[in-house]
């Protein structure tokens, strides 16, 4: 990648001619995906991470609201608990009230014009520098805070808070700079030029607990495109989110461009949707919350200066469909990882598995054998842990309720796991359930925990089962088909065309990579704007087309009139 000081010069050249601005796109920004480090015994990255984890042990960080350069504390104090040791308060923070949120809006709006007028390459430099900081000196810090605060293992923190977040910052910068090269044709005696402006107003970014990278991207992508942002981080990802915010500021992000404002959900939603200056909501979270925000925007539509843009990713009930021609080893390995990594707390996690009767004895035996080897525990103390506790008491209670339902339902049988213990942390044993009814609620509703439900279908009913896969739930996020028969793969791909925004063939339903598999789904899963791809940034720009004519216009009358 080019050195940062020369980035702007190498990307764009411009010159003024009269009142018109001419742009010539001279090159593109070359980036690659951030390598995932191994953290093997004795490696520098492992030593650095273990030191960072040791520094966090028993510690609590005080995290204020930040408006501009001012750190603000309110009387509404909250705490973030470590999921695997809820006696450990990892962060103390406060909720912004309505007055502070409105103050943040005003300060952001005052900074908007200058930020929007900065050349794209200058804004990109901020995020490229932040990516370099995350890749190098700040990597261990953000990984450790993600592990301790959100209960991630080493590898899950690495692919999230390091690799994916770095990729978001670098690839978004690449896409944004290259977008400026997308210009309309010019026909003499006129020239045409597109200016990619930020939206008029402020963007509200509402981020989830399960990916540090998503929080950085929800706030960062609109800011890159010239917008000002109010960022409401998740209460249960506060420690890592604040670290990302501080890194952006240290990388050169000016004050008031991203306001860091933890807040109660309803207070934040009510405040931003009642402001005439709201121009967008960038959201990841639950379907009910996104629907509520959408309704609030609709109810206030006459108030806004512009139509707000709503981008949302809302989860899924993701599937693995197995055909009788499938490779069993791939099915077992892919399903265990997809269903149970990070305790099933990924929007893309597999939670329903469809298996042909002919393969079920073999797949069942292998699943149960491998299930017995899964280690659940403290990821900071034991790097051999496969996954840790679920995020908080609310999640624990929700998952436990589903497991109680599984024990009482006549159509469900628990094959393995399902024990729950919240004495130290919010631990749920990975659970495999068999359902005799493909329409059982546990096959339809998102659980967001380490629960996999299997439906065994007759081999000759695979087409009917594919229809079940498509129609059983309201979601459409991710899914996978396992089959070696190419004709079956083609047929399944056609039949499941609308069932998944990210569709996998002989691979697990999780693990999308920025720049390779832009992520998102439709139906109840969201607006499918595909963060991680080149089109996502278009949601956060309002293009202006400028035409300049270089000769006098002449007579107002057309020639045929004379």
Swiss-Prot record:
A biological process from GO: proline catabolic process to glutamate
Reaction(s) the record says it catalyses: L-glutamate 5-semialdehyde + NAD(+) + H2O = L-glutamate + NADH + 2 H(+)
UniProt keywords, alphabetically: Acetylation, Mitochondrion, NAD, Oxidoreductase, Phosphoprotein, Proline metabolism, Transit peptide
Positions where N6-acetyllysine occurs in the chain: 51, 92, 98, 113, 129, 174, 317, 357, 364, 375, 461, 508, 530, 551
Binding positions (NAD(+)): 207, 232, 285-289, 446
The keyword Lipid biosynthesis belongs to this UniProt entry's keyword annotation: no
Pathway recorded for this protein: Amino-acid degradation; L-proline degradation into L-glutamate; L-glutamate from L-proline: step 2/2
Modified residues (N6-succinyllysine): 30, 92, 98, 113, 129, 174, 346, 357, 394, 508
Binding-site residues for substrate, renumbered to this chain: 512
CDD domains the UniProt entry points to: ALDH_F4-17_P5CDH (cd07123)
Enzyme class: oxidoreductase
Record PTM Phosphoserine, positions in chain: 43
Highest taxon, organism lineage: Eukaryota
Compartments where found: Mitochondrion matrix
Function per UniProt: Irreversible conversion of delta-1-pyrroline-5-carboxylate (P5C), derived either from proline or ornithine, to glutamate. This is a necessary step in the pathway interconnecting the urea and tricarboxylic acid cycles. The preferred substrate is glutamic gamma-semialdehyde, other substrates include succinic, glutaric and adipic semialdehydes.
Protein known as: Delta-1-pyrroline-5-carboxylate dehydrogenase, mitochondrial
Organism: Mus musculus (Mouse)
